[in-house]
Amino acid sequence: MTPVASTSALNLARSLYEAGIRNEAVLQAVANTPREQFLDAALGHKAYENTALPIGQGQTISQPYIVAKMTEIILQTKPTKVLEIGTGSGYQAAILARLVPQLFTVERIKSLQIQARQRLKRLDLHNIAFKYGDGWEGWPSKGPYDAIMVTAAASSIPDALVSQLADGGILVIPVGEIAQQLLKVTRSGDKYRSEVVEDVRFVPLINGELA
């Protein structure tokens, strides 16, 4: 099914361009993804504001600019196989699934995972594999990955995740507790290079599972 962009989604994409997002495929994915479908009806009127919003269980749907920025970084390697840590509402997965052939996504909160699966199915996005589990551990049996995106802030870079990167692959992850930075970690053989992208604010990446 070919998505039809709403005026609100198109306006959001334009505002992201003005904010510095330049990848046309990312902007098109934002324009074609109905963000209101990833929120409770009571928050639907705020869907196209450039702000993070609550989705329950102490979690949030990320600010659209950050979703687009992290996606833009991921696409630098032209990945075919991507791992997302923190499915959350499913919005970031919806953007990624329009842009990469294979997406694997892990969520530790069962109720959020169930809702996200239903939303993504309604959008006819079928190139996504879901796992209920601890994001700190990744999904090693499906790796290695060309890119890994983490949508919650880790206190440090998880060794388990960098070990699941393919050679030349990148990990995009917010790191820190009070002060957080978005990092791009690139694997080259047995070595890893870390670059700071910008200051950010995310909910914490928590160990374990929650039914």
UniProtKB/Swiss-Prot annotation:
Gene3D superfamilies referenced in this protein's UniProt entry, alphabetically: Vaccinia Virus protein VP39
GO biological process, one term: protein modification process
Family: Belongs to the methyltransferase superfamily. L-isoaspartyl/D-aspartyl protein methyltransferase family.
UniProt keyword list: Cytoplasm, Methyltransferase, S-adenosyl-L-methionine, Transferase
PROSITE patterns found in the cross-reference section: PCMT (PS01279)
Keyword Lipoprotein: no
Pfam families: PCMT
Reaction(s) catalysed (UniProt annotation): [protein]-L-isoaspartate + S-adenosyl-L-methionine = [protein]-L-isoaspartate alpha-methyl ester + S-adenosyl-L-homocysteine
Record-linked InterPro entries: PCMT, SAM-dependent_MTases_sf
Name the UniProt record assigns to this protein: Protein-L-isoaspartate O-methyltransferase
Domain of life (superkingdom): Bacteria
Documented EC number(s): 2.1.1.77
A cellular-component GO term for this protein: cytoplasm
Function (record text): Catalyzes the methyl esterification of L-isoaspartyl residues in peptides and proteins that result from spontaneous decomposition of normal L-aspartyl and L-asparaginyl residues. It plays a role in the repair and/or degradation of damaged proteins.
Active site per the UniProt annotation: S62
Subcellular location: Cytoplasm
GO MF assignments: protein-L-isoaspartate (D-aspartate) O-methyltransferase activity
